[in-house]
Amino acid sequence: MTRSIWKGPFIDGYLLKKVDKVREGGRNEVIKMWSRRSTILPQFVGFTFGVYNGQKHVPVSVNEDMVGHKFGEFAPTRTYYGHGADKKAKRK
């Protein structure tokens, strides 16, 4: 189920403050964040965010196509190593 339109997109408050601070300073740095649940807004386009995936901050460069999605969609949390190989075939 999607979020109600009348509520608007969810953004953590500290994230907006961090973006404003970087915009004022004019620096082009990675903005570290832990809020995977926040929605990407049009004002975030052009910035690079370090989205935490449980181990490290994955750099995510925001472009126009990402607006409306959540930050967590672009930083996978699980690593797939493939299914177990056949041990008999491996031994030969």
Swiss-Prot record:
Pfam families the record matches: Ribosomal_S19
SS bond partners: none
Keyword rRNA-binding: yes
Alphabetized UniProt keyword annotations: Ribonucleoprotein, Ribosomal protein, RNA-binding, rRNA-binding
PROSITE patterns on file: RIBOSOMAL_S19
GO biological process terms held by the UniProt record: ribosomal small subunit assembly; translation
Keyword RNA-binding set for record: yes
NCBIfam families membership: rpsS_bact (TIGR01050)
General function of this protein: Protein S19 forms a complex with S13 that binds strongly to the 16S ribosomal RNA.
Family the entry assigns: Belongs to the universal ribosomal protein uS19 family.
Name this polypeptide is given: Small ribosomal subunit protein uS19
Lineage of the organism: Bacteria, Pseudomonadati, Pseudomonadota, Alphaproteobacteria, Hyphomicrobiales
